[in-house]
Amino acid sequence: MLSVRIAAAVARALPRRAGLVSKNALGSSFVGTRNLHASNTRLQKTGTAEMSSILEERILGADTSVDLEETGRVLSIGDGIARVHGLRNVQAEEMVEFSSGLKGMSLNLEPDNVGVVVFGNDKLIKEGDIVKRTGAIVDVPVGDELLGRVVDALGNAIDGKGPVGSKIRRRVGLKAPGIIPRISVREPMQTGIKAVDSLVPIGRGQRELIIGDRQTGKTSIAIDTIINQKRFNDGTDEKKKLYCIYVAIGQKRSTVAQLVKRLTDADAMKYTIVVSATASDAAPLQYLAPYSGCSMGEYFRDNGKHALIIYDDLSKQAVAYRQMSLLLRRPPGREAYPGDVFYLHSRLLERAAKMNDSFGGGSLTALPVIETQAGDVSAYIPTNVISITDGQIFLETELFYKGIRPAINVGLSVSRVGSAAQTRAMKQVAGTMKLELAQYREVAAFAQFGSDLDAATQQLLSRGVRLTELLKQGQYSPMAIEEQVAVIYAGVRGYLDKLEPSKITKFESAFLSHVVSQHQSLLGNIRSDGKISEQSDAKLKEIVTNFLAGFEP
């Protein structure tokens, strides 16, 4: 009888004003209710049993779910930083949305407020605006659909070709692979640049720093490397293909546009993704862009493919991070950078790896770029990144203006793991070249003080001048590895010692044309064998000797 009592109690509690009673509240028998007396009369007529069943049905069928959304309010806004009160359960690096539609990322989680960096123009936000959580850590689209596209740091297309069609998304701040999934670097990553492939070889899965002052050709090395991959990506062997991601941080829009045009003209955009956070973009986007590009590259790595990512340049990312940290009131350290600026770069570059076969056998190779001030490699950020990476290519302004391009300082440039990945053919011809060039630079400094030099020193100087000339290379003209081997062979075996240094470049051009047109089988053998056999050595010797005999510069 409990249900009957409940029904009677509800009837007694009905509001006296008829307008407050819903038509559907207690069934069709209450539609005409006007006051408490009328409702009691109808209740007696309908019967308490029927009333209780209607009430039970209504109670059981009620939807008790509540859609709760955690929101906060903007306490202050300025310089791209919003202080938000009320987001008590927000996660670190979670995406939040302002009432204006702008997105931001929570970075400082403090007891009474949250420090949010704004992805865009903070003039659209004002004090008191509502901020809501999205529940998602910052992520970007990844996949083959991004190839050939130019996107911003959040993965939105900015090339005017419509939205990116990828349905797969990946968090930007993923943890680097551990020790067990990795394997040592063992496959070569050909740049097509003689000086790099012979002296500082790079392997797939390596991190090789490109460092130098402004206007010394750092970006040119990176772009040449991308263009050189066309010869592998045009083939059918998936294991040889190398997908490229170029991350432009803090550069001019015109520079990025020229770069995209250059890659398009070279037919290299079809296997390249360009991630752009230009100088006019907000500092949080410049900070985020390298991580976004890295996630796109990791998609290929984790699917058994090979990828190359270029960060151009990480100095500007560090400056953007310093700006954000100081505005978030984090304590400054050396050169006003925050204490975790080393971790900023180490957690990014550690994600480049060569995976073992049980994890797909893919790789992600990183070429970070750092700009120095007046050649000072002992500054804070350069020393940090040098200690993280597996070697560096050091470019010098002095060499650049002497016409030695690429302007690589052989003495300071090193590859710590790349020699294991270098092809045997290149090792055979370039094994002693780095030592000879380093000795030449050392002796050349003393040679200008006097001319009384012994024959061995004069021979060293003579060979060094010719090898330096031989390693010069034009921009956007990468060479296949077998062509490099043929040219360097002529230099290190002493066939060019009697040729005037000024005629070396002309010799190289004519010799390459001759070998490519007349001796394609020899180049094919070097390419397929990966080494110079005795037959190939004898053939090369014969070709060089005969060509020099009839060479007229």
UniProtKB/Swiss-Prot annotation:
Membrane topology annotation: Peripheral membrane protein
Modified residues (Phosphothreonine): 134
Binding positions for ATP per the UniProt entry: 215, 217-220, 473, 475
Top-level taxon in the UniProt lineage: Eukaryota
Modified residues (Omega-N-methylarginine): 204
Family matches, as SUPFAM superfamilies: C-terminal domain of alpha and beta subunits of F1 ATP synthase, N-terminal domain of alpha and beta subunits of F1 ATP synthase, P-loop containing nucleoside triphosphate hydrolases
Subcellular location: Mitochondrion; Mitochondrion inner membrane; Cell membrane
Pfam families linked: ATP-synt_ab, ATP-synt_ab_C, ATP-synt_ab_N
NCBIfam families: atpA, PRK13343.1
Function, as annotated: Subunit alpha, of the mitochondrial membrane ATP synthase complex (F(1)F(0) ATP synthase or Complex V) that produces ATP from ADP in the presence of a proton gradient across the membrane which is generated by electron transport complexes of the respiratory chain. ATP synthase complex consist of a soluble F(1) head domain - the catalytic core - and a membrane F(1) domain - the membrane proton channel. These two domains are linked by a central stalk rotating inside the F(1) region and a stationary peripheral stalk.
Note: The siderophore enterobactin (Ent) produced by enteric bacteria binds Fe(3+) and helps bacteria scavenge iron ions from the environment. As a consequence, the mammalian siderocalin LCN2 plays an important role in defense against bacterial infections by sequestering iron bound to microbial siderophores. LCN2 can also bind iron bound to endogenous or nutrient-derived iron chelators and plays an important role in cellular iron homeostasis.
Protein's name according to its UniProt entry: ATP synthase F(1) complex subunit alpha, mitochondrial
Organism: Rattus norvegicus
The gene coding this protein: Atp5f1a
